[in-house]
Amino acid sequence: MTKFVFVTGGVVSSIGKGIVAASLGRLLKSRNYSVSILKLDPYINVDPGTMSPFQHGEVFVTEDGAETDLDLGHYERFTDTSMSRLNSVTTGSIYQAVINKERRGAYMGGTVQVIPHITNEIKERIHRVAKNTNPDVVITEIGGTVGDIESLPFLEAIRQFRKDVGRNNVVYMHVTLIPWIPAAREMKTKPTQHSVKELRSIGIQPDVLVCRCDRPLKEGMKEKLSEFCDVPVESVITAQDASSIYEVPLIVEREGLAQQTLALLNLEPRQPNLTDWQTLVQRMQTPQRQIEIALVGKYVQLSDAYLSVVESLVHGGIAVNSEVKLNWVNAEDIEQYGAEKFLKDVSGILVPGGFGIRGVDGKVQAIQYARQQKIPFLGLCLGMQCAVIEWARNIARLERSNSAEFDPETPNPVINLLPEQEDVVDLGGTMRLGLYACRLSPDTLASSLYPQEVIYERHRHRYEFNNAYRSLLIETGYVVSGTSPDGRLVEIIELPGHPFFIATQFHPEFQSRPNSPHPLFLGFVKAAVDHYSTCLTEDEECEEVKE
């Protein structure tokens, strides 16, 4: 029978519930337990697909085309398991489903209420994940903070869950903050006590406390938390701040998180195999060099807007024993001050996805600079479209060339709306979303990076390269190195003769893993290391000449 772990958070938001859930998933998987992780988000949006990146951060796309919370990216990267639309649930999607059932007469004329109709729908979504893949353990993260009014239906649903499936089949895990007060020079447990009190008032007694803190939690403090929160002292887990999220599984493993969880669920306490993960962390902590890569975007004020891109660069760096230092460049600043001011000392330039015209000219200038200065370049989604615009304007000399998204009146729409998007009215969930096949052309950079001829990548876009300009693109030196299997959609372009210049319509960042970096990111970081080494050698030669 599938077991269930529910992860709640208290005291403050952004406490790290997603990383705790993902870390527990990693630890259970290292013991050969199968795991699926579910996120319950309390906002009323049906999904985050139409939300501003500044408010929500990255929209993570699953293989089956769901637009989900960025925590699903953590789940996939830590457990190396692909999630689906079943693993992301919002208040909006719950209410939408219940209202649709009411309209169909499914409730036989009854009064539709939060209890039992909303809570039953929430429980059904959790059971659906268990039925779909039949994992040993389903870990469910409840978004928000205990005490928020928005989370109450979810908390009531998980309270009922233990009664429904049996006491020994459910663990309640509460992630909380133990702050250090500089003036008093001590850590304080009172916020956690009040958070647990709030949780108890709903009817949930936590079985495990995961305590976020910036220094070790002393045994006396654990005993105090145990006494006041009615949690066994061995189930009070220290989750001390780490330099990298990939250290967290090892930290909580030493604290006995997985061991306590398995004991509470009456599961066999198997020995973990964390050798690969320990090696990964060790390589991260002892890089041979540091390279600087510029990320030229329009949402750079919030790094979470590009979370999977950032993590994919980290993965590539680990593989080549390098620390990737990110230079966050606002594309609008390039429009104002020029590309050289921000990009002259970097070893690689990455232009990620995005929507809307703001900052596009700055991205185009950054790509031109990468092309002319022979700096390794990787473009993703909008990054590829901007690379096409840069080609059209500066190489093909096509008058007022642009994307139809940014200038519907352009005489040269080198990027155009996908035909199937022409009659689409709604914004949410209507793009080209999810996993699609791409056929690679032989003897290209793309084919040298990937081990197979046909690849499968995740997409999120409405616009595509306009095939009316494909012949001209090729005639002027570019290569179309990846297309849809029918040859219609251009998926990858590259520039021969350049150290590394490649751009994709898809989002490779969604499939990178810490122990298995995505081929494009690995190739890009390797090229950046080569560029760094070349520049370093040239600088040393210049110094010798001066001497």
UniProtKB/Swiss-Prot annotation:
Positions bound to UTP: S13, K188, T189, K190, P191, T192, Q193, K224
One Pfam family in the UniProt entry: GATase
Pathway linked to the protein: Pyrimidine metabolism; CTP biosynthesis via de novo pathway; CTP from UDP: step 2/2
CC annotations in GO: cytosol
Activity regulation field: Allosterically activated by GTP, when glutamine is the substrate; GTP has no effect on the reaction when ammonia is the substrate. The allosteric effector GTP functions by stabilizing the protein conformation that binds the tetrahedral intermediate(s) formed during glutamine hydrolysis. Inhibited by the product CTP, via allosteric rather than competitive inhibition.
Keywords for this protein: ATP-binding, Glutamine amidotransferase, Ligase, Magnesium, Metal-binding, Nucleotide-binding, Pyrimidine biosynthesis
Domain Glutamine amidotransferase type-1: 292-534
Single GO molecular function: glutaminase activity
Record-linked PROSITE patterns: GATASE_TYPE_1
Family: Belongs to the CTP synthase family.
Note: CTPSs have evolved a hybrid strategy for distinguishing between UTP and CTP. The overlapping regions of the product feedback inhibitory and substrate sites recognize a common feature in both compounds, the triphosphate moiety. To differentiate isosteric substrate and product pyrimidine rings, an additional pocket far from the expected kinase/ligase catalytic site, specifically recognizes the cytosine and ribose portions of the product inhibitor.
Subunit record text: Homotetramer.
Full protein name: CTP synthase
Species: Rippkaea orientalis (strain PCC 8801 / RF-1)
